[in-house]
Amino acid sequence: MKKQWKPVDSRLNELMHEYSVSIEDLVECTGLSKQRINDYVGGFKSNMNIGTAMTFADAIGCSIEELYVWNFKERRQLTK
């Protein structure tokens, strides 16, 4: 069995506080709208695509791994 990692929850709001990054900072650094960022920070929009996640991680100064709470499940290994 292999591990399959799944993002369980976003840590965006927590990391913004930890790294002292405001919503206005993210608007300026990412070019995303304030409303869209508020939706992610407030948890109203939970499914962030990989590009958006990388954009936030880069703007905050953290890794993409830090941006999420992760969980894994066992999955079967493909056999030949």
UniProtKB/Swiss-Prot annotation:
InterPro entries: Cro/C1-type_HTH, Lambda_DNA-bd_dom_sf. One of its GO terms (molecular function) is DNA binding. It comes from the Bacteria. Gene3D superfamilies: lambda repressor-like DNA-binding domains. Pfam families: HTH_26. Residues 23-42 bind DNA. Keywords: DNA-binding, Transcription, Transcription regulation. Residues 12-67 form the HTH cro/C1-type domain. This is SPbeta prophage-derived uncharacterized HTH-type transcriptional regulator YotL. The gene is yotL.
